[in-house]
């Protein structure tokens, strides 16, 4: 019995010593564990929600030639995925975002109900040009955040992302799955 307890104690100490800690002062980062499959990566954050990498997205300057920033994206393509969005997530890293893909081009409006992190909501036309940005959306707010222009895509990234990386109206995006 004592040998069994010693083995458990040694295994516990070993596991505690293997834990990696993220010491960044950024409020939107967490300790993560990444699992790679043949087609996508899933990042499980410390609060248990899962970010599934389903593609990459590049922010391009107005000319489309200069890459301003690249991020990993999770896609929201079905009605259910678009309705859930980033609800209930407590964190997201700066190199992640969610791209909502709609079947049509029309004015959009998002809200922050059940969304715990501040977001920049980027509205994008069918020609991949950014037509509107709602910056620093207030967590848990039910206020409507309209696009004011027709959009086929909506990208959600951490609040302050657009200011930090100089993303602006007229810039373009390119993404691949």
Per-region residue spans from a language model:
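Compact, glycine-rich, soluble single-domain proteins
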Residues: 19-177
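C-terminal motif of bacterial Sec signal peptides marking the signal peptidase cleavage site
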Residues: 15-17
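Sec-dependent signal peptide recognition
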Residues: 2-10
